[in-house]
């Protein structure tokens, strides 16, 4: 299932999925989505966290070893896999598909990816991730939507500003919300 970052809070309030994939064009929104997922998991007792980063030379068998290992300290844990390039390669793609077929119990899996093109999103490994859990897409905030988006963000913090200030902020952060 694919949702937007705006829909994530509603999805997390219902029930935690065993797998979340966070990807997209807007780094701030991907960071915030991953933080929300981790916070919701901690609230449900998922205390321990293991992070794997798939860089060149990554041993893909470590993904399944981590998934199948038991924690000495906590019964519930978060297993996070970061694929900074968004390209797991042939071996990685096969490992991801196998991983999706046997998701570990008492583990919330969080996969962090950058922006993916249409070919990557239609790949076997990504469609397996999407079918096994919830894919959260962080789309870039369009220029015409940015003033409203900034206003909503300010309102969430119980702040407000006039239209001229909002326009000034929009001009300064366009293309770089971080």
Annotate each language-model stretch with its function.
Residues 1-178:
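Conserved beta/loop motifs at nucleotide-recognition and modification sites
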């Amino acid at each position: 299932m694919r949702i937007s970052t705006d829909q994530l809070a509603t999805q997390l309030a219902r029930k935690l999925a065993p797998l979340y994939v966070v990807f997209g064009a807007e780094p701030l929104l991907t960071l915030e989505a991953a933080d929300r997922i981790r916070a919701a998991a901690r609230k449900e007792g998922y205390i321990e966290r293991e992070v794997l980063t798939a860089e060149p030379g990554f041993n893909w068998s470590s993904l399944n070893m981590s998934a199948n290992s038991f924690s000495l300290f906590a019964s519930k844990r978060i297993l996070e896999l970061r694929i900074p390039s968004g390209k797991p390669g042939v071996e990685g793609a096969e490992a991801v598909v196998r991983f999706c077929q046997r998701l570990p119990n008492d583990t919330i899996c969080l996969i962090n990816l950058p922006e993916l093109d249409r070919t990557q999103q239609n790949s076997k490994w990504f469609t397996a991730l999407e079918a096994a859990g919830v894919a959260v897409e962080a789309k870039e905030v369009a220029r015409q939507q940015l003033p409203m988006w900034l206003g909503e963000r300010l309102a969430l913090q119980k702040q407000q500003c006039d239209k001229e200030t909002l326009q000034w902020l929009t001009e300064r952060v366009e293309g770089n919300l971080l």
